[in-house]
């Protein structure tokens, strides 16, 4: 029931995690990458920065929306600027940062999945105790809700880490 709410987030994070410079090299149709794409890049970076700030400030819905929009813009850049990106190799520092971001994203996603599992278990316990122990029922429900919210935040954070790699890959557009 509630797990299905988080599956698109989890799947989206996996999709973003899988995208890297090597995938960009597989683009078949060369497209021109020009000044309009630099504008898209700057907009995506601004959205990503704002999403991170909103998430830190506790505005989860806004953070999710902005991360999703940034992801859409980076997807456009991948489709249209992929061939040019393939000609540019990442530096050692960028490769190292890419690995760090991938690990952080995977860690956040794993923690989100653990929180979802724990929250589902607490929800099941609460349902069993609803009629016999209403105080314990309410306690489990509050804890489950808090864990679901924390899992949601962590999955968004995972997506932001993954999108930071796209920011790095297309950084040449801002120069």
Cite the ranges covered by each PLM segment.
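Glycine/proline-rich, flexible active-site/cofactor-binding loop segments
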Residues: 21
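Bacterial N-terminal signal peptides
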Residues: 10-18
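Bacterial N-terminal signal peptides that target proteins for export
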Residues: 1-11
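Long, charged/polar, soluble alpha-helical segments
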Residues: 25-175
């Amino acid at each position: 029931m509630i797990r299905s709410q988080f599956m698109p987030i989890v799947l989206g994070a996996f999709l973003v995690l899988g995208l890297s410079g090597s995938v960009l090299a597989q683009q078949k149709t060369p497209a021109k990458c020009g000044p309009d794409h630099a504008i898209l890049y700057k907009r995506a970076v601004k959205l990503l920065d704002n999403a991170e700030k909103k998430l830190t400030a506790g505005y989860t819905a806004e953070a999710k929306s902005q991360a999703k929009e940034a992801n859409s813009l980076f997807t456009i850049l991948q489709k249209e600027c992929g061939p040019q990106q393939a000609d540019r190799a990442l530096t050692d520092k960028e490769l190292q940062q890419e690995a760090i971001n991938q690990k952080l994203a995977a860690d956040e996603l794993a923690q989100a999945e653990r929180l979802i599992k724990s929250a589902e278990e607490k929800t099941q316990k609460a349902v069993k105790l609803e009629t016999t122990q209403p105080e314990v029922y309410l306690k489990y429900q509050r804890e489950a809700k808090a864990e679901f919210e924390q899992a949601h935040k962590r999955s968004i954070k995972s997506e932001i880490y993954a999108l930071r790699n796209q920011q790095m890959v297309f950084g040449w557009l801002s120069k």
